Amino acid sequence: MRRSLVAMAAVLLSCVIGGANEKPPVVQDLIHATPAKIKKAALAMLVLDGYTVAYYTASQLRISRQWSSEETIRFNTHHWTNGPVSNCQHVLTLILLPVGLDQAISVTMHRDTVCHADGGWKIWTGDNEKDVQWMQTTLANLKAKIEGADQRH
């Protein structure tokens, strides 16, 4: 029960940290590892998909992947009534908060898309079902990779 309350508090805190009026969809889980180990494993997993570090602190990892020209063309074609976008990136943020005394870390993940448009920057939150499913799968794979490796040692 205590873990559930602490985990819920971590999710609520991560929404406050974001500062948005609307709460973006997030995926959250507890991982029994140090923040450094979680960050290292996340980068090892996601660098294969073209992600690089955009921002790094003790409690947050933000990584991004530049859109391909095909993705940009497809987006601009699909949204032809809007102005064209360029220099788009998928941005994945992991917020890492310690939970209790058993070295568990609450990992909260959310995904945004950032594009240059109309002389400024536009940000879209990954709130569709496909994005949420991707985050759930990615976080589950990250947890399995870390905790599975710990059990083998």
Regions found by a protein language model. Give the residues of each.
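Bacterial N-terminal signal peptides
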Residues: 7-15
